[in-house]
Amino acid sequence: MAKTVYLGMIGDIMHPGYINIINKATEYGDVIIGLFTDKAIANHRRLPYLTWEQRKNVVESIRNVSRVVPQDDWSYVSNLLKYKPDYIIHGDDWQVGPDKYIRDEVFKVMEKLGGEVIEIPYTQNISASGIKQEIDALGVTPQMRLSSLRRLIAAKPIVRILESHNGLTGLIAEHTK
């Protein structure tokens, strides 16, 4: 039975960095892509340009990808426990910074599963975030903003705010559901 390699990604704007890590993953076994859902992304970053289904179609068409599964949480733990890969591969950019806690979780889970974490050098001078900034600088239409707002509302809970200026409106705000 072939070994399995888990790779989590957003997969919105495909670039050489994604292809590099997928190709490296195939050296270790069959590649399972944990494709972050809009819900998982919405609490940490801006929504992707493409919907989850569109991103899934793109990633599935990449030659070395064996399977694409939804990753509903920013944390990898639930998918690692569900799919029990032999390896997880990730760029080394998570060794420091805001995603370090995720790295620490992954190491603990993979140790428990008897698997291995493989970190490869992050591809320099290109990132989906940088490409997105360039695209955003070109501007968007009102229809694109409306479509993005609808997807965002569907992906994460709405925050409701009721302004209070006196005791009565304060009581109303406290008891409003």
Model-derived regions, located:
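N-terminal amphipathic alpha-helix/helix-capping segment at the start of soluble metabolic enzymes
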Residues: 131, 139-176
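Nucleotidyltransferase catalytic core that binds NTPs
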Residues: 1-144
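Short amphipathic alpha-helices and their capping/turn segments at secondary-structure boundaries
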Residues: 18-27, 167-177
